[in-house]
Design a protein with these regions (language model features):
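Short, polar loop/linker segments at the starts of domains and inter-domain junctions
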Residues: 33-48
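N-terminal helix-cap/turn-to-beta initiation motif at the start of protein domains
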Residues: 14-24, 175-178
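Bacterial Sec-dependent N-terminal signal peptides
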Residues: 1-20
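Short, exposed beta-strand-loop hairpins at the edges of beta-sheets
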Residues: 156-165
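Buried hydrophobic residues that stabilize the cores of well-folded domains
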Residues: 20-26, 30, 155
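C-terminal/domain-terminus segments
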Residues: 82-85, 165-176
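Contiguous, well-ordered beta-strand patches that form the walls/edges
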Residues: 28-34, 50-152
Length: 178
């Protein structure tokens, strides 16, 4: 009976563990992209050169812990845009999108990741459910992404509908699974 119990519940445990760990945007072209439909990044996607230009964004990491806590590490700088009241480029994070502690809920069956906490996000801070915000004051306290984990558990693809289209963010583990 113990063996059967383990076999029934082992897959459930592995689903929740899929997202645990530390992730960074994949240092490649199209790690960030936007387009008219899910998975379509025809409106814009980052180039390989943007990985260097936006190095302050690509070095940010997000750690998901087993207890539902997450930490967004921005290392003192991230990519800023005009909607934040700053010139486009690398600079000190602007509140409330300053990283730090938040919580998350991952549902492997539904393929969703919800991050909770004012300003908590993955990808770009301006992208929330149903909109791109135009001021830091409009930050959301909860954002839900459609997520898929692939490449042996080492790639996380997050999609979010912002109204007129979809953003896509591709992350990779900082320490790959064996």
């Amino acid at each position: 009976m113990k063996k059967l119990y383990f076999l029934l519940f082992a897959p459930i445990l592995s689903f929740s563990a899929q997202i645990e760990g530390t992730w960074k945007l994949a240092p490649q072209a199209a790690a960030l992209g936007v387009g008219p439909g899910l998975g379509n990044t025809s409106w814009w996607s980052n180039s390989a050169g943007d990985v260097t230009t936006r190095a302050c964004l690509f070095d940010d990491s997000i750690k998901f812990e087993a207890n539902g806590n997450m930490t967004h590490y921005m290392n003192g700088s991230t990519w800023l845009e005009a909607w934040q009241g700053a010139p486009e480029g690398c600079g000190a994070p602007i509140a409330p999108h300053v990283g730090g502690a938040a919580t998350y809920a991952y549902d492997a069956t539904a393929g969703t990741l919800t991050v909770n906490g004012l300003g908590a996000h993955i990808g770009l801070a301006k992208v929330i459910n149903g909109a791109e915000i135009s001021s830091p004051a409009a930050a959301a306290s909860s954002i839900t992404y459609n997520v898929a984990i692939s490449n042996g558990g080492n790639t996380l693809t997050a999609d979010i509908n912002f109204g007129p289209g979809w953003w896509r963010f591709v992350y990779q583990r900082t320490v790959p699974l064996a």
